[in-house]
């Protein structure tokens, strides 16, 4: 979902930024009202933000972006979409600065998709499901929570697909065709992730209700009567899933998927619906449904769609079963991979020789490079900016080349995937290589698409290198001081500090619980894996909730007056550093003006 730095051209990144500012300002007003009415909710908000940070850091490559669980459904159900947009903004900023996920110019677009569209969909579905249920029970509550959590995930990626389609419409079919392509590529990973996230959040909700039902009562999500209805059902044990049930479930999934694909293919053969053929991009590894030799009749296309989708569903179920077998047979000689292996770049920034340089100066240096880089109409200036940033990071900031190269690998994979799609579907200009046509889509490389793909790739490289320089040289605590000097609302700064604190509380507690579960065989089977992981997430919620209450009590006992103490920034500005920054900005601005004049 994180659209990477430099991927959105003008004026789209400005449009989404302005729209995000309006939404976040409304959310901040709601946050201030919530904190004034219920001050005890601030630690819980920090907890929800940290939960979103952890879940949304589990990423898989996708076109110009990344696929991952969002975690926003949980926070949206608890606090509503307005407040959710605020802590999602904080999380996205932290991920850009701590992990270099996303970007600065694309921050507005990411906020709209992850912090506004997804939570809004989750809240609407949860409210509707809560109203239309025939009777309140653990089953109806679980179905409502599952639908809300899965919808938050899927709507987020639908909005991201729309943002990319508006920025890069297809040569044939325009925005709608491009939207279908992007959505199809996202769906490779996102549909299974949405289902898994929905199941995980349902298990978390049920576990929290069993341990701390007062949380839902205090937040006016459930009444005391409703929590009493849920409590007996929450304690029932689930029967184990046998091999035969796996086979039956797999057959049902394959039949349903194949039937749906056959139905969509049949609709796609009708007049005016040819764009539905783009569903073949859901699985890029299978044979595309086109027949240049006319060996397959048009009537067979629907069956081929069904066969392809059925094979894909069968492979998915079989892989899940193999994962179950592998988990059961895995020994303890090798350290298992966990979600907490992500390297927090803030550690590198604390040890950086440029740490003492003013955060204001580094912000000016990087933001100017990012904005000028994404504004450049030619790829040469962004490549020059990327080279300067790489030199500054490796030579001046003394960042390890191996670390820097590993950090750039994943963004370059994302950018390369997006550039490849732009290269093949944009069209325009003289045709260089003509590949094939699938329905309304003509896959070819033209002079215009080649220039646009090179420009997007160079802009992304410049933006990511600039963002990495800021991330690797500026601790997040220095940015808190900058926010305070910018006269940001104190509730926003306090919430940012709490989320930052809870991130490390989450990681520490999660590692301890995860290691204890491994020693007790908690991840021996696929069923135990899912159960243990959901219990881990729920226990993290409970423990951090309790720590949040303890923090609030300790703050109150120390005369907390609504303003957390923040140390002054120790950075300084030397004449040499200031001169170097301003000369660099003047140089790239002059080169930008020269490019504009040449065009």
From Swiss-Prot:
Domain of life: Archaea
Transmembrane segments: 12-32, 44-64, 74-94, 106-126, 140-160, 162-182, 183-203, 247-267, 303-323, 356-376, 377-397, 407-427, 438-458, 463-483, 493-513, 579-599
Pathway annotation from the record: Cofactor biosynthesis; adenosylcobalamin biosynthesis
Entry GO MF terms: cobalt ion transmembrane transporter activity
GO cellular component terms listed in the entry, alphabetical order: ATP-binding cassette (ABC) transporter complex
Keyword Membrane applies: yes
Membrane topology reported for the UniProt record: Multi-pass membrane protein
UniProt xrefs under InterPro entries: ABC/ECF_trnsptr_transmembrane, CbiM, CbiM/NikMN, ECF_CbiQ
Residue ranges, annotated region (CbiQ): 341-599
Locations listed in the record: Cell membrane
Assigned keywords, A-Z: Cell membrane, Cobalamin biosynthesis, Cobalt, Cobalt transport, Ion transport, Membrane, Transmembrane, Transmembrane helix, Transport
Region named CbiM: 1-239
Function: Part of the energy-coupling factor (ECF) transporter complex CbiMNOQ involved in cobalt import.
Quaternary structure, from the entry: Forms an energy-coupling factor (ECF) transporter complex composed of an ATP-binding protein (A component, CbiO), a transmembrane protein (T component, CbiQ) and 2 possible substrate-capture proteins (S components, CbiM and CbiN) of unknown stoichimetry.
PANTHER family reported for this sequence: COBALT TRANSPORT PROTEIN CBIM (PTHR43627:SF1), PTHR43627
HAMAP family xrefs: CbiM
Family the UniProt entry places it in: In the N-terminal section; belongs to the CbiM family.
Protein name, as recorded: Putative fused cobalt transport protein CbiMQ
Source species of the chain: Methanocorpusculum labreanum (strain ATCC 43576 / DSM 4855 / Z)
């Amino acid at each position: 979902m994180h659209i990477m730095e430099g991927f959105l051209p003008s004026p789209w990144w400005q449009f989404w930024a302005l729209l995000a500012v309006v939404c976040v300002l409304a959310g901040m007003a709601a946050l201030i009202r919530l904190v004034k009415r219920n001050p005890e909710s601030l630690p819980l908000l920090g907890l929800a933000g940290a939960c979103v940070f952890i879940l949304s850091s589990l990423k898989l490559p996708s076109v110009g972006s990344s696929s991952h669980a969002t975690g926003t459904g949980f926070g949206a159900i608890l606090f509503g979409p307005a407040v959710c947009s605020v802590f999602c903004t904080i999380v996205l900023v932290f991920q850009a600065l701590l992990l270099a996920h996303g970007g600065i110019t694309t921050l507005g677009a990411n906020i709209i998709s992850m912090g506004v569209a997804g939570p809004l969909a989750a809240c609407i579905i949860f409210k509707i499901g809560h109203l239309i249920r025939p009777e309140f029970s653990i089953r109806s509550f679980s179905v409502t929570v599952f639908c809300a959590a899965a919808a938050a995930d899927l709507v987020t990626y639908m909005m991201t697909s729309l943002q990319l389609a508006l920025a890069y419409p297809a040569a044939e079919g325009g925005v709608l065709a491009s939207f279908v392509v992007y959505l199809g590529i996202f769906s490779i990973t996102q549909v299974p992730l949405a289902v898994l996230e929905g199941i995980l959040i349902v298990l978390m909700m049920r576990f929290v209700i069993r341990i701390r039902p007062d949380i839902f009562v205090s937040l006016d999500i459930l009444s005391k009567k409703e929590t009493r209805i849920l409590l007996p059902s929450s304690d029932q044990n689930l029967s184990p899933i046998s091999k035969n049930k796996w086979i039956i479930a797999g057959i049902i999934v394959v039949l349903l998927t194949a039937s749906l694909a056959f139905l969509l293919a049949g609709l796609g053969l009708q007049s005016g619906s040819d764009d539905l053929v783009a569903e073949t991009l859901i699985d890029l590894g299978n044979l595309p449904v086109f027949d240049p030799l006319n060996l397959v009749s048009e009537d067979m296309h629907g069956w081929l769609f069904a066969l392809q989708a059925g094979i894909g569903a069968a492979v998915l179920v079989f892989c899940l079963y193999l994962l179950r077998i592998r988990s059961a047979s895995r020994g303890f000689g090798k350290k298992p991979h966990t979600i907490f292996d992500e390297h927090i770049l803030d550690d590198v920034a604390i040890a950086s020789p440029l740490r003492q340089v003013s955060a204001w100066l580094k912000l000016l240096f990087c933001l100017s490079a990012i904005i000028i880089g994404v504004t450049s109409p030619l790829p040469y200036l962004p490549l020059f900016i990327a080279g300067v940033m790489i030199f500054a990071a490796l030579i001046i900031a003394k960042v390890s080349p191996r670390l820097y190269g590993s950090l750039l690998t994943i963004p370059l994979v994302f950018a390369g995937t997006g550039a490849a799609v732009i290269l093949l579907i944009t069209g325009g200009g003289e045709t260089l290589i003509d590949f094939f046509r699938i329905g309304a889509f003509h896959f070819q490389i033209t002079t215009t698409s080649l220039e646009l793909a090179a420009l997007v790739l160079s802009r992304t490289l410049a933006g990511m290198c600039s963002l990495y320089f800021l991330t690797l040289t500026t601790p997040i605590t220095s940015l808190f001081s900058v926010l305070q000097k910018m006269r940001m609302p104190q509730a926003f700064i306090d919430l940012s500090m709490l989320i930052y604190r809870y991130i490390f509380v989450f990681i520490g507690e999660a590692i301890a619980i995860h290691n204890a579960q491994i020693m007790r065989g908690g991840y021996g089977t696929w069923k135990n894996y899912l159960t243990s992981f959901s219990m881990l997430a729920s226990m993290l919620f409970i423990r951090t909730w309790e720590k949040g209450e303890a923090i609030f009590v300790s703050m109150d006992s120390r005369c907390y007056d609504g303003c957390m103490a923040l140390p002054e920034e120790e950075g300084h500005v030397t004449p040499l550093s200031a001169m170097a920054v301003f000369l660099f900005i003047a140089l790239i601005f002059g080169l930008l003006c020269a490019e504009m004049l040449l065009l």
